[in-house]
Amino acid sequence: MKTLYSLRRFYPVETLFNGTLALAGRDQETTGFAWWAGNARLINLSGKLLGAHVAHAGLIVFWAGGMNLFEVAHFVPEKPMYEQGLILLPHLATLGWGVGPGGEVIDTFPYFVSGVLHLISSAVLGFGGIYHALLGPETLEESFPFFGYVWKDRNKMTTILGIHLILLGIGAFLLVFKALYFGGVYDTWAPGGGDVRKITNLTLNPSIIFGYLLKSPFGGEGWIVSVDDLEDIIGGHVWLGSICIFGGIWHILTKPFAWARRALVWSGEAYLSYSLAALSVFGFIACCFVWFNNTAYPSEFYGPTGPEASQAQAFTFLVRDQRLGANVGSAQGPTGLGKYLMRSPTGEVIFGGETMRFWDLRAPWLEPLRGPNGLDLSRLKKDIQPWQERRSAEYMTHAPLGSLNSVGGVATEINAVNYVSPRSWLATSHFVLGFFLFVGHLWHAGRARAAAAGFEKGIDRDFEPVLSMTPLN
């Protein structure tokens, strides 16, 4: 007899409420958390929580490797990276792999190797994650006391913090070693239009490095985002790596002071909220860095910054009209200010027109034309090189504007223009993720503080309305 319906649809469906889908320590009855509360079920199961974290690391590294190989497979060496929607290859190129003078890609094999290495390590992490989630000990305290912990154990928590800080410090020094000893990194400021070079003369002067932290975040100052030479960036990583490593050792060797024990909440959810806050700050800083900084994120790979594209347009038309006989030093614009050049309130010569708001842009193609008082009129008349004209015309037409449907350029652009800058994607995504992480911080911090104060209720699971409803099956 032909069955009209699959018999399977009459079999009982495992739902949240019939309690039979029980894995020890992972069902609603024993943990107080339903399946959708994710790792909350594992708060007191250090072995299973380790599995979740290792598996998560495996997913992250798998994405990195897979996306890396996807970008390599689609990469066209004749086109700039920023025209191809790439976000991983520009990072590898910035580290000096596979590129030569002017940011030209001469070898894609290092990119392939990077993707394969990430895929292989993701398999190792994936196996470890599955092992610890399904097969390994539920708790580590008994068999591996070094890896065990209790959330309330303040001394153990600061020891774990110290280990993490040391790992971050080692990560910072990996960049330092790459720049110093292992082939160098890409320097967009290298003479003649950018090149890979070893960074030899590090900036270790604390007044310079920490001076960045004391700068105003506003125009012309730009806080740490204003860093514009690699000596400062690599020297900053020496300082940062050293502080992280010494701070990590200090946290391993010491116990929290009394004021810290009183001021902080010591629970798993509190630590989660602190971590989310830190990641949120990182996200916002990364957003500003990739949007404004063309030294750590060279325009050869990521496309021009917004201010850079705007200044490039002013420069391109200055070059054109000067060739046609305009006197760019004295021509007046429709507002009575200089059409091509004007003076800023502090007296230096800057580009006129709407781009005056971006007067503080620094870019390798423009700096040779500056003198002690801003743009130098005699250099603009005599010293403009063809490579500067080509670079600015290219950047003018690749501003980091664009909509979600990939119709790039200004709002009036024709639909045939299919370009969205990686800067737009990276800045927007990091801002949005930073914001979500901040909201998550507020949520978990509020819950952790309420629980510590003793009035955290949550949903009343005994009288939850859904418990009195007919089960789905």
Swiss-Prot record:
Q: Which residues in this protein are found as N-acetylthreonine? A: T15
Q: Which domain of life is it from?
A: Eukaryota
Q: Where in the cell is it found?
A: Plastid, Chloroplast thylakoid membrane
- Span-the-membrane segments of this chain are 69-93, 134-155, 178-200, 255-275, 291-312, 447-471
* Major site of localization recorded for this protein: plastid
Q: Which residues carry this modification: Phosphothreonine?
A: T15
Which ranges of residues are annotated as propeptide in this record?
Answer: 1-14
> Record keywords: Chloroplast included?
yes
| Single GO MF annotation | electron transporter, transferring electrons within the cyclic electron transport pathway of photosynthesis activity
Checking InterPro entries in the record gives: PS_antenna-like (IPR000932), PS_II_antenna-like_sf (IPR036001), PSII_PsbC (IPR005869), PSII_PsbC_sf (IPR044900)
| A single GO cellular-component term on record | photosystem II
Gene3D superfamilies, per the entry: photosystem ii from thermosynechococcus elongatus (1.10.10.670)
Membrane topology, as annotated, equals:
Multi-pass membrane protein
Q: How is the cofactor bound?
A: Binds multiple chlorophylls and provides some of the ligands for the Ca-4Mn-5O cluster of the oxygen-evolving complex. It may also provide a ligand for a Cl- that is required for oxygen evolution. PSII binds additional chlorophylls, carotenoids and specific lipids.
The record's keywords, sorted A to Z, are:
Acetylation, Chlorophyll, Chloroplast, Chromophore, Manganese, Membrane, Metal-binding, Phosphoprotein, Photosynthesis, Photosystem II, Plastid, Thylakoid, Transmembrane, Transmembrane helix
Which GO BP terms sit in this record? photosynthetic electron transport in photosystem II
Q: Where does [CaMn4O5] cluster bind?
A: E367
Outline what the protein does.
One of the components of the core complex of photosystem II (PSII). It binds chlorophyll and helps catalyze the primary light-induced photochemical processes of PSII. PSII is a light-driven water:plastoquinone oxidoreductase, using light energy to abstract electrons from H(2)O, generating O(2) and a proton gradient subsequently used for ATP formation.
The subunit structure is: PSII is composed of 1 copy each of membrane proteins PsbA, PsbB, PsbC, PsbD, PsbE, PsbF, PsbH, PsbI, PsbJ, PsbK, PsbL, PsbM, PsbT, PsbX, PsbY, PsbZ, Psb30/Ycf12, at least 3 peripheral proteins of the oxygen-evolving complex and a large number of cofactors. It forms dimeric complexes.
HAMAP family associated with the record: PSII_PsbC_CP43
Family under the similarity heading: Belongs to the PsbB/PsbC family. PsbC subfamily.
This one is known as Photosystem II CP43 reaction center protein
**What organism does the record attribute this protein to?**
Daucus carota (Wild carrot)
